[in-house]
Amino acid sequence: KKDGYLVNKYTGCKVNCYKLGENKFCNRE
């Protein structure tokens, strides 16, 4: 399951998350 794997790039940051296809992306606030 790949969902959320990109979230790890922002560990320790406050993020806004959204799903796009099979991947979960987060943007730093």
From Swiss-Prot:
- Per the annotation, which location comes first and is thus the protein's main one? secreted
Q: What is this protein called?
A: Toxin II.9
Q: SUPFAM superfamilies, per this entry?
A: Scorpion toxin-like
The job of this chain, per UniProt, is described as: Binds to sodium channels (Nav) and shift the voltage of activation toward more negative potentials. This toxin is active on crustaceans.
Q: Give a brief account of the tissues where this protein occurs.
A: Expressed by the venom gland.
Task: Give the residue spans that cross the bilayer.
Answer: none
The terms describing its cellular component in GO are: extracellular region
- Compartments reported by the entry: Secreted
Could you name the domain of life of the organism this protein comes from? Eukaryota
The UniProt entry, under PROSITE patterns, shows:
LCN_CSAB (PS51863)
**Which keywords, in A-to-Z order, does the entry hold?**
Ion channel impairing toxin, Neurotoxin, Secreted, Toxin, Voltage-gated sodium channel impairing toxin
Family recorded in the similarity comment = Belongs to the long (4 C-C) scorpion toxin superfamily. Sodium channel inhibitor family. Beta subfamily.
- Regarding domains, what does the record say? Has the structural arrangement of an alpha-helix connected to antiparallel beta-sheets by disulfide bonds (CS-alpha/beta).
